[in-house]
Amino acid sequence: MRRLLALLALASTAFAQPEPKVIKDVRYRGGDDLTGYEAERCKLDLTLPPPAAQPFATYVWFYGGGLKNGSKTLASEHCAEIAASFAREGIAVVVPDYRLSPKAKYPEYVDDAAAAFAWTVRHIGAHGGDPRKVFIGGHSAGGYLALMVGFDPSRLKPYGLGLKDVAGIAQVSGQVFTHYTIREERGQARYSVTSDEAAPAFHVRKTLPPILTLYSDHDMTGRAEENQFLIAMLKGAGHVETTSLKVTDTDHGSIGHNLRFAEDPGHKAIGQFIRQQAAAR
């Protein structure tokens, strides 16, 4: 019996899936002119899938927090768990920190998001990834950042990149009008509606990268409607690679945090979107 148990244990070890590799606190901004706050915040964690025969796709993921709060190490954001869950399926995940209001003002946090994406395109090949297959996304304020980087070509231009370098956008319940924190920085009301150069909706056009939008059936006030508006405007502009999913039995928080579970409908939708779009590039 002992010998049988030992053989079973050995067999289970042999067939066990290797765990993802995590590289922490990689600086994505450099130079001698960085402020102390930039040096503190402009770092990312890279979660790599087990070695594969083909270069893998990568998902740059921005957590939420209203552009005022959040950290890649904050337990309530579940960033490490989300990253590991996708990495086990063969998709690398990059989770950057970024500067926050009020220490930072618009467009500094958007520029940080663009810098993190650019770092990924330039460096993921050294880790086994395909730089042509770098996707971007996030939850809530993170979704807003992903949309701004993926919609406004001026954000990537300083890094010698363009929207063609964005393999796709998979965002979760992001703000599509000018973010309320930016409006507050300007002295405007939180629930006023503004769509200017700081709004993803301002940059809608036919030629944007492929887009997947997830939103909740019990989302925060106005957020589901904002995302539905974005979907409608993209389709109206002739953008043919627009897909969406209303994730039921979720609220504004759980729709993002549940992505750490492989069986979650949102997780499945994002994984399928990345695999399909990566195969097409």
List where the protein language model places each region.
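Mobile cap/lid helix-loop segments that gate and shape the active-site cleft of serine hydrolases
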Residues: 19-21, 25-31, 166-203, 209
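Serine-hydrolase catalytic-loop signature spanning alpha/beta hydrolases and amidase-signature enzymes
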Residues: 66-69, 73-74, 93, 119
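N-terminal cap/lid segment of alpha/beta-hydrolase-fold proteins
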Residues: 17-54
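Alpha/beta-hydrolase
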Residues: 62, 172, 247-250
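C-terminal catalytic histidine-bearing segment of alpha/beta-hydrolase fold enzymes
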Residues: 214, 221-224, 228, 235-281
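Primarily recognizes the serine-hydrolase "nucleophile elbow" in alpha/beta-hydrolase
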Residues: 115-185, 195-196
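Short beta-strand element of the alpha/beta-hydrolase
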Residues: 55-66
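Short amphipathic alpha-helix adjacent to the substrate-entry channel of hydrolases
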Residues: 73-94
